[in-house]
Structure formats: structure tokens, C-alpha cells
Amino acid sequence: MSNNIVITGQGIISAIGVGKEAVLRSLCEGRTGIGTMKHLNSIHHELPVGEVNLSNDEMKTILGIDRSTEISRTALLGMIALQQAIDESGITTLRQVSTDKHIILISGTTVGGMDLTEQYFGSFDQDDSHIECMRQHDCGSNTELMANHFGLFDECTTISTACSSAANAIILAANLIKAGQADIVVAGGTEALSRFHLNGFNSLQILDKNVCRPFDDERMGLNLGEGAAFIVLEREDEARRRGADIYGYLTGYGNACDAFHQTASSENGDGAFMAMTTAIEMAGLHPEHIDYVNAHGTATPNNDLSESAALKRVFKNQMPPVSSTKCYTGHTTSASGSIEAVISLLAMKHGFVPANLGWKNPMPEGIIPSMGIENHEINHVLCNSFGFGGNDSSLIISRFAATDKENAPKSNIGDITVLAQVEITDESELEEIRNYVKPLEARRMGKIMKSSLLSSLKALEIAGIDTPDAIITATAWGCLDYSERLLKQLQEEGEALLKPTYFMQSTHNTIGSNIAIRLKCHGYNVTYTHGEKSLDWAIRDAKLLIQSGKYKTVLVGVHDEVTPMMRSLMERLGIKVMPSSFYSKAIVMSCGR
């Protein structure tokens, strides 16, 4: 049985078009989609964005959804991209003739339904007129909405690793297919602009007031964007058996953690280097075989310097054409990995390198990006997605199959065992954190950051493990306290002088990346955020890693908190809430050999 993973469908919606044909035209014409915001209700019109040129009502009409139905923009964008990918792949017809195929949806997002939450946040303590929208606040509920709209999927889950979310969704898809746990997986990401998102990034002072200039010495920061993209993945033999069109092969991928800082990359780009080299090795390639690199290239001073260093370490004096396409779409954060995967597929099929728009001035220590190449044969594309917290992932998309050296999960790894398990639910237990961190650092940490780190360190101590090979985190809500603080500040003080600490601590992968930074763990790192199923998926992924034979020990954790306000909202909605204000459980899993 072939282990080659092929791409049989693709869908995309972004600032440069709805559908791959429109996106292709914009790329070939060198036309950016970054401009003045039209749909986002923000005072910051001085900040250009990569906004999708459709209102929510227009998207509902396209999808056949009643305009009175309240649906997050994140879910709507995802549905449109999903519809395209599903139609192109023909899996609707396949489902009609073959009900035994196991089809999974994996979506990457960080914002979730924040656009609805921030719109009605001020009314929650007054009446119940809009609290139903809180059912869409969490990331997992948005994926469920998308899955239910199509009625094709047997399972779905959500990954949130900031800007690498969609890339990690694609990696999980491949691992599930190789393990025989899925026949077809539709994977990608979706993200909508929100005031929370825009002001959070603005508080970090990394937004440019002009169109961004990746890898330029005078770059001033990124432009936020929105959009969604999904690709359909399956085994090559199964795709050929059903007569599906094959648009490319996913031949390699790598997931590594920079383990350096919550919002900054290391000077030498260690995580990026490891992600790229792992992907190239998996594909059975050498660096000189890469014909184009779709860089993460955010145009922030830190990222472009760090990514340049990593690229130079990988390619040395044989640098292939490199460009960032965020100068077209804006930085679509959690959706960027899949949006840029589709762009890479288009570049490969049509034989061109997209121009790195706006670049003029070389960085002293940077790479020289491509200003566009026509008639350029591309057999292998390296596509980079690097997120906050050092969650770095790379994909290799190829015109033809790899050497097929990636085999099925190893059968001789031994039984998977739990070496240690630590649960923390009481606030008094958190005092123990002072045994592991300095008092000043402990005072700066919120409850969930303390409980997640403490439970993890204690579990590893019991297991006799200094550093695990991988860290997998499960959280339904993430650092809810900091998200709520930022929302309150937006409501009470408006869109000015927001605290960067609140935003930095609000992303779901903050928990897992904080543990990795503490342990200097550069291995696989991912966060699941799919409600009550988050832990099940985390454990499932841990088993996949161990069964692959490449990982011996995996630290799995489930960490959540609930604020008084959220408890009130959930109780009013009739949703079960955990009894304590926080809950942490850390599990150390091993193959036992």
C-alpha cells in the first residue's frame, strides 16, 4: 500500500480573491489586497489590512444561510474555502456512493468567534439578548459549525498554535492518514479580523502603517489579514482508484519549537531551522532540491532576521528563490499555513515565483527575496509557518512522490505507558510553584500558567524525565483570564494604549510554549482546542508520535480556567462548567522501551 499523501482539492478565500483562479490572477499581476479596512469596525484606519471583500451577509448568501442567522466571520470564511475544496475533490459524490470512508476535518484558528464576542461583550452583564453568541466564542465550536454545515465529516478537531495552526492541521492530517485512522482529511485554517486581534498586535508595536515589505531593511512591521484555505489529503492509491485529480504531494513536514520567547524568535532561528531540515529529510531530499521557498516573512524586524538566519543555515550558498506572499494577503495568522500552501500549489502548477512586493533595500544579514520569476520549473516547494511561542512548522509540497521512505507506524516500540500523572485543582497547591521558579516570576504568572507549569514539572520529575521529546497541550478556552482583561480594556478604555501582556498571554498555545521555553524542549509542540474533546485528541496525537518510532516520551497536558464572568455566562446558557476556577492535569507518556 502506497504511503504517498496527495492533495486532491483546494479552496481559498483571501484579500486577493475568492477561489484559486482569482488568487492566481492577483499573484501574476503583482496586485496586493492590502488596503483600508471596510468591514472591520475599528478606529485604526491608519493601519492597512488584508480584508476579504465580502460582508458577512454576502457570505451567508453564497453559502445558502439565512441572513438572520448569527455566525462568526471565522466560520463563514472557513465554510467558503471548504466548499471549494470539497467540490474540487469530489468527496461529496464519494460519500454518496461509499459510506465506509472515514473523513475528518481539521481546522486551525486562534480568534474563533471573537468578532461576535467583542461586538456584544458590553451587554453580557445587562441581559441575555446576545449571550447565545458565546457558544461560538471558542475555537472548537467554529470548527463544529463548519463541519455540521456540510454533513460530510465523521470527526473534526481544532488546532491553535498561533500562526502555524493551519500548517499543523495539515501535518496532523498526514499522520492520521499514514496511521490508517482516516481515509480522507480536509485540513487547513480560517481566521477573521477582529478589534481584539488588531489592537493586540498593535500593542506589540509591530504593525506597519504602509503595505508591509518583507525582508526589506526599512521594514516596519506586518499588516494583519484574514481568510481561509483548506486542502483535501488522501493516499495516492485511493485517490487514483476513485479517479481524483492530483494537484500535488505532501512529501515532507516538520514541527519544532524555538523554545526561546513568547513573541520573539531566536537570533539563529533554531526552531525554524529544525522544522525545515526535518521536512526536507522526511521528503528524502537535499536542500538543493528545493525550487522555491514560500517564507513566513512577516516583515517584522525580528522574524525576517531570524528566518533569514535559519534559511542561510539550511541552504548555505545554494539559496533557492525565496519570497513572502504576506505582502499580498496580509498576515492571516492561523490561516496563513494553508493559504500559503494553496499559493505554493499554484506557483508549482503554473511555473512561477510570486514577487516579494515592496522590497527595495537589502538587510545586512538578510536573504535577498525574489521579485518574481516567470517560466520557473518548480518540483518542490518549502512552505514555512512560524508562530508565537516558537511553534514552527514547515511543509514540502511536491510535483511528484517522494522516495516513500516514510513507512507505517513501527510495530516494535513496546506498549505505550503512563509514567506519571499529576492533577492540580486547588489554589493552595499553586504555592509549590516557588520550588521551581523565582518569586518575582511566580507573582507575574496567572493561575493557569502556574498550574500548567507546576503540574508538568512535577509529572516529569516523578517520571524521571528532564526534557520530553514532544509537548502536546489540550485547552478548551486557553488563557481566558487575559482574554477577558483585554476585552474589558477595549470596552472601557477604547482602542488605545492596550496592555501587550494581556495579548501575549491570550493565545491558546501560550501554555504549551511556556512549558517548552522552561524545559528548552525543541521537539514537536502543538495545542488542541476543541472543547471537551481536546484531551482525547492530544492523547491520540501523542500515541501517533510514539507509534511512529521517532518519539519516546511525550508530555500531554489539559489546562483550563474559568473566570467569574464566564461561569455566569455558561450557567445562563445551561452549559456545564468545571467546579474550580482552574484545572490542570499533566501526563507523561512513553513507549516503554
Residue spans for each PLM region:
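Internal active-site segments that recognize and position negatively charged phosphoryl groups
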Residues: 172, 541
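Short glycine/serine-rich loop segments
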Residues: 173-196
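Active-site histidine-anchored catalytic micro-motif
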Residues: 169
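A short, small-residue-rich loop immediately preceding and capping a beta-strand
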Residues: 155-161, 183-189, 553-559
